[in-house]
Regions:
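Residues at the starts of beta-strands that form the adenosine-phosphate
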Residues: 2, 30-33
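Histidine-anchored nucleotide/phosphate-binding helix
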Residues: 14-27
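Short, glycine-rich nucleotide/cofactor-binding loops
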Residues: 3-15, 41-48
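Short, intrinsically disordered/low-complexity patches at protein termini
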Residues: 29, 38-40, 57
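A glycine-rich helix N-cap at a beta->alpha junction
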Residues: 50-60
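Short internal beta-strands
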Residues: 22, 32-38
Length: 60
């Protein structure tokens, strides 16, 4: 299956879950592309104690 994920927010939980979904999908042999739109382009710079976004992005 092919998935396209559009991230249009800089809310830590939403961004973390989007990349977690993408990583899990890749591990299950699906094709995944992520498009950052609007505030989503700030994803890599988001700091959160509860959600390790940088780790999820690196795993992706």
């Amino acid at each position: 299956m092919k998935f396209g994920i559009i991230i249009n927010t800089n809310e830590p939980e939403t961004v973390w879950n989007a990349f977690r979904f993408g990583t899990t999908s890749l591990l299950n042999d699906h094709e995944v592309k992520v498009f950052l739109l609007g505030k989503g382009v700030e994803s890599e710079g988001i700091e959160s104690e509860k959600f390790n976004i940088k780790e999820q992005i690196q795993l992706f």
